[in-house]
Amino acid sequence: MKAAVKIGFPFTPDIEKDMKMFYESLNEKDRRHYAALEAKKLCYGGISYIAELFNCSRPTIHEGLDELKKKDS
């Protein structure tokens, strides 16, 4: 029987640090949109991961996703 392989998220600590610095340089609306885009790229678990990484709420990310959907319409 094979051991289970743990699949983690793709960001190294250095990349996470750069992402946080960039996130903190943005205004509030752009932060929502950036967090939403990063969460969307990660699919399952992405919202929770990005919310923890950027210290923002999951509803904030959902709001960003909604705003981006409205922009596409």
Question: What do these predicted regions represent?
Answer:
Residues M1-D72:
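Double-stranded DNA-binding cores of transcription factors and transposases
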